[in-house]
Amino acid sequence: MVGKSQQTDVIEKKKHMAIPKSSSPKATHRIGNTSGSKGSYSAKAYESIRVSSELQQTWTKRKHGQEMTSKSLQTDTIVEEKKEVKLVEETVVPEEKSADVREAAIELPESVQDVEIPPNIPSVQLKMDRSQQTSRTGYWTMMNIPPVEKVDKEQQTYFSESEIVVISRPDSSSTKSKEDALKHKSSGKIFASEHPEFQPATNSNEEIGQKNISRTSFTQETKKGPPVLLEDELREEVTVPVVQEGSAVKKVASAEIEPPSTEKFPAKIQPPLVEEATAKAEPRPAEETHVQVQPSTEETPDAEAATAVAENSVKVQPPPAEEAPLVEFPAEIQPPSAEESPSVELLAEILPPSAEESPSEEPPAEILPPPAEKSPSVELLGEIRSPSAQKAPIEVQPLPAEGALEEAPAKVEPPTVEETLADVQPLLPEEAPREEARELQLSTAMETPAEEAPTEFQSPLPKETTAEEASAEIQLLAATEPPADETPAEARSPLSEETSAEEAHAEVQSPLAEETTAEEASAEIQLLAAIEAPADETPAEAQSPLSEETSAEEAPAEVQSPSAKGVSIEEAPLELQPPSGEETTAEEASAAIQLLAATEASAEEAPAEVQPPPAEEAPAEVQPPPAEEAPAEVQPPPAEEAPAEVQPPPAEEAPAEVQPPPAEEAPAEVQPPPAEEAPAEVQSLPAEETPIEETLAAVHSPPADDVPAEEASVDKHSPPADLLLTEEFPIGEASAEVSPPPSEQTPEDEALVENVSTEFQSPQVAGIPAVKLGSVVLEGEAKFEEVSKINSVLKDLSNTNDGQAPTLEIESVFHIELKQRPPEL
């Protein structure tokens, strides 16, 4: 204060003068002239009021003096001295000052008002911040806070704030306040973080800007860092606030996503919120559980999934998925970005095994193992995925399916696990959060490694070329493998456990493979687009190992055809070979494809997104806005990636084939050819289970698929957009998309197809998904026909592999939709 008072002696006086005026208004405010006093009082009025105000102030000050003693004393002495001086000069200067300041302040306050208006923060908090901001302001605030925090603040801002800002207090006070605010922010106490911005606004627009910046940075950092607290807080608090800030965090997610709208939002709030919510809601558990647990969470879900796996998983998981997904999804949606990141991250995480895709190519080897894991993963994924997948997948798928598809898929896949995480986290920072989420999530998720790599990797990768490739691959792999990866070994066992293990595995593999296949198609596409070759290859390798293992030979041939057919026979074969699993893959491919189809439906959408690069189309369709936006972006990229091209084919192929099959449930049938063998079984068993897994896988896949292509693109291209988009549209898209997957459920399939067609009837699917899950398989048939019809439509979109029914996928997907939607909303 001394330095300040000295440096701003005159200024202080001015401030005081202004303050007295502020006081007047404040006094007035106290009096009851809250709004009016602020802008209405003229300098003279202020003077007169000021006199009384000062008296009041002094009185109040004294009153608050004890509380404000340190602050007030500092300010009091200085202020009083200055005030005394000012009292004399006050009339003259303050008037001018106040007029000028007022004008300036008016400008500031206007913005500030808006910002400040939020004074949801307790006056006390404001007080603290304010007092911290400026002793004078602080104590004034204290005095005034109770009366009209907002107005006083604004007025204060007018004078004290504006002047202070002008003065240099911004440096000291503002900085101080900022720091305090940040602290508060960190504490989440006041939302100072949030409001600090407001408060800062109060402090000054400059400060607000700084704070906002700080906040944003801080929040982002926080997001990335502890800020989770802040974020959480913000998220939590913000959830509401954030919602406000974000949108409502999208739900929370939405709002949060919107938070994206908020500046922080995206970065922090949204993800944070959602993420947090999601993370909290699900991610944290899911995240931790999910991610870490991925097996764990998923594990639980896994167990559940395993237990309920197919149905239960679907159902159970879905609920959880839905449940979490809802939250999560929101997160996911939100995750979009972060999601994406996380997604990626997740992917990465998941992928990490994949090598995070970066290694994707290498990882392929890695992945390969993961592929081995892949199955497990898949199973886990299947389960996890189911759970997650369902949960995430759903989210993911949908999300991924569309815009999310791209991203979500990435997200989804990993997100499946991570999705929540990714979702959540991603959501969180969206981008920064993304990373943070990524890190956080990943870290949290356990995927830390993955995350790290993923985050770094994946995000980067996925986002970057890797985004495509990694995405493609990762997703592909990740989707395919990472999940597989992570869980793989386990999963595989579990999976194996399940018969589906192999099938599932195969399936998973299929998913993986399929995913890879589909994905690969995607990947291929992606590959085309991204490079995928590695992914492909890897998939091929990974898949081969895995898939091959299952029906590397058989499916591959068949699937290969389809797959190959779908995207790149060449590649597909690679993949497909792995897709061997393709039989499963075929199935899965169906599933995956289906998923793809579903996803594709989404994919279609996404593919549409991707295909059209129909990013627009699908995205437009699905997430048109977001999807479009992200997808468009993403998609275009994907399109670029080839996803558009390839994916379409794959999408088409997958969707077409898958979808039709999906439509059919026939996946078993259709897939039968490919899936036939494993699929039939798998499908049957897995169908439920596998479906889940497959779906998951598929979902995963598609996500991977779509996502890879898209996400890769998205990741890469739209990462940010994606993030937001993903979040946004992922949510929406995911919703839409999710549904498709849900639709995919078979009933959903049809819905899927329908959804796909509809694009998301997904919503309906959303509803359906869970329910249909069980039905899915069954309904799949009935729906299958419908779906077939739809598939026909989709077929148009994805004529290639119509045969393969993505019945499975549906399950995974639907969860998301529900979740996503809110987020979307």
UniProtKB/Swiss-Prot annotation:
Bias type Basic and acidic residues, positions: 277-290
Modified positions (Phosphoserine) in chain numbering: S160
Keywords in alphabetical order: Calcium, Cell projection, Cilium, Flagellum, Phosphoprotein
Composition bias type Low complexity, residue spans: 348-357, 398-407
Compositionally biased residues, Pro residues: 610-676
Main location: other
Database matches in InterPro entries: FSCB
Positions of the UniProt region annotated as Disordered: 1-43, 113-139, 168-232, 244-718, 732-751
Single GO molecular function: calcium ion binding
Compartment(s) of residence: Cell projection, Cilium, Flagellum
One BP annotation, GO: negative regulation of protein sumoylation
Keyword field contains Signal: no
Cellular component, GO, one term: sperm fibrous sheath
Modification after translation (UniProt): Phosphorylated by PKA upon spermatozoa capacitation conditions.
Positions with biased composition (Polar residues): 21-40, 200-220
Its job: May be involved in the later stages of fibrous sheath biogenesis and spermatozoa capacitation. Inhibits ROPN1 and ROPN1L SUMOylation. Binds calcium.
Subunit structure: Interacts with CABYR. Interacts with ROPN1 and ROPN1L; the interaction increases upon spermatozoa capacitation conditions.
Name this protein carries in UniProt: Fibrous sheath CABYR-binding protein
The encoding gene: FSCB
